[in-house]
Regions:
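C-terminal structural segment of proteins
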Residues: 1-191
C-alpha cells in the first residue's frame, strides 16, 4: 500500500544501515534530511509514544512557514533540527500510517552520489483522496509540507501548466540553507 515509502527506504544509507535501522529510529533522529520521513509526513502519519501520562499519537506534519513556537503550541513532533516534541519520560513505540483508498505518491531524492549519501533534497508528492500532498526534506529545519502548493492543486486535474505553476509556488515556500551539500538557490531549483 505504500510503494513510495519502500522507494525511500531503498535509498536510506548503506545496505548495512538498511539492515539495522528502524522506521521509528529514523523519525526519532529528527534530521530534516531523513529519507524515510517525507513519505510519512505526506501520509499524515503519527508517532505513537508512551510515557508517564499514558499513550498518545503525535503528528509528524510540520508546515512551511511555521515557527518553532507554533509547532510546540499544536503539539507537533518535529520542532527544529534534532529537537522534538516529546514530553519527559516518553518513548516512541510505533507509527500509525493512515491509508487512503487509491492513494498514489512518488518519492524522489537528489544527492551527489547514488548510494550512502545524505539528501540534498528529498520529496514525496502524491494524491490522497481529493488532496495532493507535497512533503519536502532538506529545505527547512524539519521535513515540511507545502500548504500553498497543496491548496493550489486541491481538487484539480493535473496539466503541464498547473504542474509548472505548482513547481514555482513550491520553490517559494521553502527556505533552505546553504551548506556543504548545496547552496540554498540550488535546493530551491530542485524543488
Amino acid at each position: 500500500n505504500y510503494p513510495f515509502y519502500a522507494q525511500a527506504a531503498s535509498v536510506l544509507g548503506s545496505q548495512l544501515v538498511r539492515g539495522r535501522a528502524t522506521s521509528v529510529g529514523n523519525v526519532i533522529n529528527a534530521s530534516p534530511l531523513a529519507d524515510t520521513v517525507t513519505p510519512l509526513v505526506a501520509c499524515d502519519a503519527k508517532l505513537v509514544v508512551v510515557g508517564p501520562e499514558g499513550q498518545r499519537e503525535v503528528s509528524l506534519v510540520s508546515w512551511a512557514g511555521e515557527s518553532q513556537e507554533e509547532r510546540i503550541a499544536r503539539g507537533a513532533f518535529f520542532i527544529f533540527v534534532r529537537k522534538v516534541g516529546l514530553k519527559p519520560g516518553e518513548m516512541a513505540i510505533g507509527l500509525k500510517i493512515p491509508y487512503v483508498e487509491g492513494q498514489k505518491a512518488v518519492f524522489t531524492k537528489f544527492d551527489r552520489r547514488k548510494e550512502v549519501d545524505l539528501s540534498t533534497v528529498c520529496a514525496t508528492v502524491g494524491k490522497f483522496g481529493e488532496d495532493y500532498r507535497v512533503a519536502i526534506g532538506s529545505c527547512a529545519p524539519t521535513p515540511i509540507r507545502l500548504p500553498k502548493t497543496e491548496a493550489l492543486l486541491k481538487g484539480k486535474k493535473l496539466t503541464p501548466e498547473l504542474i509548472g505553476e505548482a513547481a514555482e509556488l513550491a520553490g517559494s515556500e521553502v527556505s533552505p540553507i546553504s551548506d556543504v551539500r548545496a547552496s540554498a538557490e540550488y535546493r530551491i531549483s530542485l524543488v
